[in-house]
From Swiss-Prot:
Fluoride-specific ion channel. Important for reducing fluoride concentration in the cell, thus reducing its toxicity. It comes from Mannheimia succiniciproducens (strain KCTC 0769BP / MBEL55E). Na(+) binds at residues 77, 80. It comes from the Bacteria. This is Fluoride-specific ion channel FluC. Keywords: Cell inner membrane, Cell membrane, Ion channel, Ion transport, Membrane, Metal-binding, Sodium, Transmembrane, Transmembrane helix, Transport. InterPro entries: FluC. One of its GO terms (biological process) is cellular detoxification of fluoride. It catalyses: fluoride(in) = fluoride(out). It is found in: Cell inner membrane. The keyword DNA damage does not apply. GO terms for molecular function: fluoride channel activity; metal ion binding. GO terms for cellular component: plasma membrane.
């Protein structure tokens, strides 16, 4: 596949995923003012879809590379990065690599919280 074809597939999927996430936020976030319900549902949906795709790929290794670029890298990548994180952890758990899976979980959770905190602190410091 030519590079520009890959970029079109990824970009098309990303546009759809980002639009869905935005729409879910518009509709669901106002329902619970103190909680980003749209984001939570987007993460849950992305994890559910990547679980379906992972299982299909495991059962059918000939699964199209183009479809993976469109759905996983593009659509789910823009809908949520949590789905990729979830897939990596689950893949290790399924392979009974418990410590690696727990390590990935810890690194993502604590690392993201730390970097979010650093971003908040830097913004406060600059203002």
């Amino acid at each position: 596949m030519i590079m520009w074809q890959s970029l079109i597939l990824i970009s098309s999927g990303a546009a759809l995923g980002a639009s869905l996430r935005w729409g879910m936020g518009l509709i669901l976030n106002p329902l619970f003012a103190a909680f980003s319900f749209g984001t939570l549902i987007a993460n849950y949906l992305g994890c559910f879809i990547i679980g379906l795709i992972m299982a299909m790929i495991w059962q059918h290794p000939q699964f199209s590379g183009e479809w993976r670029l469109f759905m996983i890298t593009g659509f789910l990548g823009s809908l949520t990065t949590f789905s990729s994180f979830s897939a990596e952890v689950m893949e290790n758990f399924i392979q009974q690599k418990w410590l690696i899976g727990l390590g990935i979980m810890s690194a993502h959770l604590f690392g993201c919280l730390i970097f979010t905190g650093i971003g908040v602190l830097i913004t406060r410091w600059l203002n």
